[in-house]
């Protein structure tokens, strides 16, 4: 907890709650925060792990929703956040980066808007924790949800929720805590209030070791290498006739590239990359329906390449060659 609190500048380590993944953390935060009649502002960049809890609360608690639209490059207009605020607005929920285009959101700017209007700011850092700087105090983040198995390099089955002091959530599950056994209610103090049941101790130990590794190597060093690999791939494939690349590559971003080859089905392209070249990609809709609609790729989907610290330039060149051959 102390390592994660330091990593994200969460002022209190006991306000770091362990979860199984980002999806659990997001459900915990969204369902524990919102009341009937609340209004929430989110964006077209959101993953289904944000969208589906919101849609469920829209149906079950009459929570109303507004979305900041994305353009054909996956960009958003920050002024739209303020234009969408109503008297009953409770929170702004925003991903730190699109899992499809890789485009990053200026969460410090959004946090300032939220706090200027007395709103709670929830950030989905699934795509960025471990690769882009996150400072809960400086960026005015009230609730931060993250996963351990992506850029934090930890095991699957790890994640968490960091809460600013003063934020209270209804527990979305209750049960054994190992303390206050004779209390019929869930204990009030964090993290116990939100950690019913046995935690993934082995996974948490692995995540702790991963944080040590990131600190030793340096997050900026990791980010620079991943960005260099991503740029090498982007420059190679964007020059290939018949290839369409999605997203804004002039702005801050993560090391993913989503593309299509002509009108080929994205699943078939991904299968060919795996079977013929040994390249693992993610095709389809990426749990990001609003983003695909914004990009006009709802029918075809897209093929997403993700680049990490352990990839090499030779692997990037192989991937470029594979895309070129499939496009011919």
What are the language-model segments listed below?
Residues 1-328:
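Pyridoxal 5′-phosphate
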